[in-house]
Amino acid sequence: MSDSSREENVYMAKLADEAERYEEMVEFMEKVAKTVEVEELTVEERNLLSVAYKNVIGARRASWRIISSIEQKEESRGNEDHVAIIKEYRGKIEAELSKICDGILNLLESNLIPSAASPESKVFYLKMKGDYHRYLAEFKTGAERKEAAESTLLAYKSAQDIALADLAPTHPIRLGLALNFSVFYYEILNSPDRACNLAKQAFDEAISELDTLGEESYKDSTLIMQLLRDNLTLWTSDITDIAGDEIKETSKQQPGE
C-alpha cells in the first residue's frame, strides 16, 4: 500500500468514526494495519484501530448482556419455549462476537505485535490482545472459556512485565492495563482480592508520582485513576450487593483501549 492510500484509509476511518459507521471503520483500519511491515502504526492510527474495534465489539457485548438477562428471567418463569428462542438468538450474537475477536486477534498476532518497536506500542497491543481474549471468556463455556482466560492472563502478564519496567506509573497505557487486568481478575477469575490489590497498587503508585505527570496525558491518566478508584469502592463494599452496578474498564476514549 502506498503512503497516499494509507493516508486515504486513515482519513476514511476518521469519516466513518464521525458517521458512527464502525464496521467500515474497522475495514479501513485493517488495511492500514497490514502495512506495518513498512512502518508501524502511529499513535493516532493505533487509537483509530482501537476505537473502531471497541465500538464494534461493544455493541455486541451490550446486546449479549441484555439477551442473557432476559434468558435468565424467562428460565426462572419456566417459559421453555421462549428460552429456546432466546438461546438460538444468543448464539447468533456469540458467533458475531467470536468473529470480531478472531479478526483483531489475528491482526495483532500476525502484524501488530511483531512490528511493535517501542515499549509503549508493545504494551498497547499486548493489552489489546488480553482484552479481546477476555471478551471471548465472557461468553464461552467449558474448555473454550478456560483457554480464553489463560490466553488473557498470558497477554496481560506479558504487557505488565514491559509496563512495569518501561512505562511510568502515571502512563495512561500502564494505568489502562492495570484497570482491565483487575477487571479480568474480578469478573473472569472471580478473584476479588487480586483484583483489588492490583487496582490499589496501580492507583497508589500513580498518586505518588502525580506531580511528574505531563499536561498532555494528565486528563487521560486521572480519568483512568478515577475508574480504578470507582472499581475499588465497588469491590470493597458489600460485594454481595453489587448487582446492577457497572464495573468500569477503559472505554473507547482512553488511549489504552
From Swiss-Prot:
GO cellular component, one term: cytoplasm
A Pfam short name: 14-3-3
Cystine connections: none
Top-rank taxon, per record: Eukaryota
GO BP annotations, alphabetical order: protein localization; signal transduction
InterPro entries: 14-3-3 (IPR000308), 14-3-3_CS (IPR023409), 14-3-3_dom_sf (IPR036815), 14-3-3_domain (IPR023410)
Family the UniProt entry places it in: Belongs to the 14-3-3 family.
Name this polypeptide is given: 14-3-3-like protein A
Lineage, opening ranks: Eukaryota, Viridiplantae, Streptophyta, Embryophyta, Tracheophyta
